[in-house]
Structures are given as structure tokens and as C-alpha cells.
Amino acid sequence: MKKVSFILGALVSVSGCTTDDLNADDVELSTSSSELGLRWLPNNLPIVNTLGFSETFSTEGRVELRNEFFDEFGTNDRTCGSCHKVTEGWTISAAHTRLLFELTRGRDPLFRTNDGTNSPNADVSTLSARRSAYSMLLSRGTIRVGIGMPANANFELVSVDDPYNFASAAELSMFRRPLPAANLTAIPTVMWDGRVTGATINDALKDQANGATQGHAAAPNPLNDVTRQQIVDFETGLFNAQAYTWGIGFLDANGAGGRAETLAAQNVEFTTVIPTRDARRWNLFDSWQNSTDPDRRAVYRGQELFNTRPHVNDANGNPRPEFTCTNCHTVQNFGTDLAGRFFNIIDTPTVALRRSPDQPLYTFRYTGPPITNAGGVVTTPTGATIQITDPGRALITGQWRDMGRFKVPSIRGLAARAPYFHDGSANTLLDIVKAYETFQGFVFTPEEEADLVAFLSAL
């Protein structure tokens, strides 16, 4: 058998053939850093993406590739690095996933039935069957997460519409993007729904490493504490950001504060008290306010829209000046939330309209007492129902109020890791902006949309 190894950050061109023309018995593709002979990568090595290139800075002095993060502890050939790739902003992109599928005929360790297929019972016996079975992973870069209905919840599951006839109250199927394994010094909560907790974030990350190894990698035994800590030490030393954007140049030019190393120098202290508007103001590109380069001025204008533009938020549709992008993205220049809050940014009644054909749709009924607002008006009567593709935090707390709520993720290094949101439903940075206009009441002109995209692409 011939073994072909390559670096996924390289440009690959395939002309006139597909994997249907290849004999899988003759060629096995390897993306393992060990088999490539790479022991480490230098800090700030440029990794090309569609908008420029990103970089990773490690506090170890270089990005090690021979450690527990890249070791196999399970039974399905996976490592932490299977879903958290240095070339993809320490997660996976949908584009990368599709390329990997074509090059390996869907046999790379990323493609496993325990969480990669739309149902764990999916047929993966042929190439065409695998292409169908892994459709959510291929189209949205999402992994299937199975969670059962919580005990003593104040809601009940009324019905399940699952195209693959698997999801039930015992195990609902949710499809979520892997979160980046970098910039972790700025996260107060672990996992999209916060289900992994600990006395400290370090403890929570250790439990997450073990849970992922036993779940995603199908390890028969728990990781020992030393191994867990070694994985966490590696992760928490990684900082990832866009370094260079086409047409703009290096993102620390002329006094700007972009790039990864500036994140490593930033001290983040978590608090339940939301910082003042000035304290959470992003300032990466202040020096470009009066730049002679129009593209750099656009990045600055996008930053200021992010800092200052309010959205319609009260019952009368009036702008509330304190409700800007930084009201949720409170960690300055990282974009996470200092208080570890969970938000539903998509109007719940419209979730069904945004559903992928391969996603299950759930109908839930509220069984608790009527919920009223501060004025005593009933906002949620007993018996209210909703349809939703992912209940989010509600499956952890059992509380109706947490339906569709998710943590606030870091928004650095976005260019390397499309698609966006927890379910991969936004394909581009402009799609993100449009979603906030639709569901959160932001109002931007086309020029302002372009400025925001310029800003997000520079993060």
C-alpha cells in the first residue's frame, strides 16, 4: 500500500478526477504530524486561508506537535488534533472537511459513526453512503452531540422530526461546531452549553479533555490526571489570530494591535460584574483611524461599529445605547464574555425556518407556571410550545428560559474557520452581520456591513 502524506495548509488542486477514480486499497492518506516527521512548528508560521493568513503563538516558544494532544488514546484512531487542527484555527472548517473526505474517500479518523454521521446507525459501507451519512459534517463542519432529556425539566418533548429516525428523549441529536482549542485563557465556560464544569477553568478543561477522549475518540479508559493536565497546559498556551489580510497587509502595521502574540500578553480576569462600555471597548485598530490606506480605515470603522452601534432591544423598539456587540462580547479584543453568560441570538420561532434538511426538529412544551415580565405581563403561558433544532443550555439546566441559549465564543481567527455560529449556519462573515440585523435588530447600511466584515476578517 502506498501512503501519501501532506500538509493540509498547502494548496491542493484536483483536475479531471474525483475520489471515485481512486482505488482506496492502493492509497492511504495520512495527515498525522508524526508520520510527516514534524515535531513542531515555529511560532507565527503563516497558515493560508481565503482572506489572508493566520498564525498561532505558543507560550512554549514553538507549537509542539508531538505531545498528548496529538496522541491516540482511543479505539478509532482519533486524537484531539483530529477535530482541532492548527491549519483551521484549531477547529475544523467545512471546506477542509470536504477536501479531507474526497482525498480519503471518507475514511480519515474524522469520519466516524459515533459522532460524525447524522445518525450513529448510518450506513457507511460505500462511498456514496458515506457522502450521505456525513452530510452535516461536510456541509456545516458540525459534530453530532447526543444528550438526553434532563430529569425534572420544566418542559417536555412533544415530538421529534428526525430524517434519520434516531433522535428520541433518551438521546437527542444536536449538531455543533467544534470550538477552537486556542485562546482559552479568555473562556469562563467550557463547551457551547456549559455542561462541563469544575472548581476552576483548568479543572473544567481537564474534564473536557477526558470526556472528549472517551466520547469522540472512544477511549475505553479515562485519562490519568497527569495526561489531562499536559493536554490543558498545551491548549492554554496557544493563541490564534489572523496575521495578514489580503489588501490590508499585516494586522500590526502602523501601531495596530492585531495578530496572535498580543493575545498572549493580555491578562483576563473573570467577573460576574459586566465591565463598563469603555472597559470592554475594542482598540486593536485605533491607530488606523486616519490611515492613508482606505482598507485600513474600513477596518477601524468596523471596529467602531462593533463598539458603539446599538440594536433595537426594548419592548417599544427603541435603541438602547448600552446594547452593542460588546454587551455580549465583553472580553476586550478576545470576544468572549467575562461573566460566562448564555444567550439566544436567534429568534426561537424562526429556528425551524433555518433548519438544514438533515437536522432533527424538536417540539417542546412548557410545563411550568406562567412566566411574567417585570410589568407582570405573562410572556410564556403554561403549555406554550416551540420548535427548535438545538435546545442548547436548556438540556443542561432543565429550564425553559435556557432554550436555544449558548455561550459566547471567542471571535478571533474567524477567517480560518468558517462556517459560523454553534450550528455552522452562517457560511460567511457577511452572513453573520446579516443574521444580527435580522434577529437582533441591528441596522447597517451596505457600506457599514462591508466595514464590519473588514473588521471581522482582521481578527
Regions found by a protein language model. Name each.
Residues 9-10, 336:
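Enrichment for repetitive, rod-forming helical segments
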